[in-house]
Design a protein with these regions (language model features):
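Terminal low-complexity, intrinsically disordered regions
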Residues: 1-131, 136-143, 148-231
Length: 231
């Protein structure tokens, strides 16, 4: 490595580390048989958007395993560092208006988070822990969920082409490497899904499409890195 190359390589390494940390935890979608995961950042964007109609303003949001010791093994290898399939816990700090009873706001927020987690994403949430951090005089304005920014990728092989053609797939992505990463008898596919499709349903369809398109029918894992709207 030359002196000139050193700073550029260091900057590239630092950027890659920041990008990986920005994804948050890799959360299981569905159960152990589903072979699918979603980044915490992508899931949090959907949950924040859903919470905006509850009368609460979510300040911090964290999603983790409810009890990793009880989590079963997945049927396929997951992405490096991914949480095992199992029930999840959502922790949220929020502010609320004094013009509405706090228990009612908390109940509405909890219901919104649980509904979005199940119906829009496919997360199995066991509990929601809420903590109020501030009381406001006025109702907080609706908050649009921030869409995760990810690097998109074009299909480069049969697996990528099959995945990209599944309804609900916006694009392939390369947050952890290439859009399709191959191991021995196993493929991992990264992608962004459309907000009008349930993320787990899209991931299941991608797994089936890729396994059927590739010779020898490898096992397939899917990582959803963004949930976004079509342009």
């Amino acid at each position: 490595m030359t002196t000139a190359d050193g700073p550029h390589r260091a900057d590239g390494w630092a950027a890659a580390v920041r990008e990986r940390l920005g994804l948050g935890r890799l959360l299981p979608l569905g159960g152990p048989e589903d072979g699918s995961w979603i980044t915490e950042r992508a899931a949090a964007g959907v949950l924040r958007e859903a919470a905006s109609g509850s009368g609460a303003s979510v300040e911090k949001l964290r999603i983790d395993s409810a009890d990793a010791s009880r989590a079963p093994e997945p049927v396929v290898p997951g992405p490096p560092g991914a949480l095992p399939p199992g029930r999840l816990r959502i922790e949220a700090d929020f502010s609320a208006t004094v013009r509405r009873p706090l228990p009612a706001t908390a109940d509405a927020l909890r219901a919104a988070l649980l509904s979005a987690a199940a119906q829009r994403l496919g997360l199995l949430v066991e509990e929601v822990d809420l903590r109020v951090t501030d009381l406001l005089e006025e109702e907080p304005p609706p908050e649009a969920g921030a869409e995760a920014k990810v690097r998109t990728a074009e299909p480069e092989d049969l697996a990528g082409t099959a995945a990209a053609g599944v309804p609900g797939v916006i694009s392939l992505t390369r947050a952890l490497g290439g859009p399709v990463q191959a191991g021995v008898g196993h493929l991992q596919v990264e992608l962004a899904t459309s907000g009008d499709h349930r993320a787990l349903d899209v991931a299941r369809a991608v797994r089936a499409a890729v396994a059927g398109a590739v010779e020898d029918r490898p096992t397939v894992a899917v990582l959803v890195t963004a949930v976004t709207e079509r342009n």
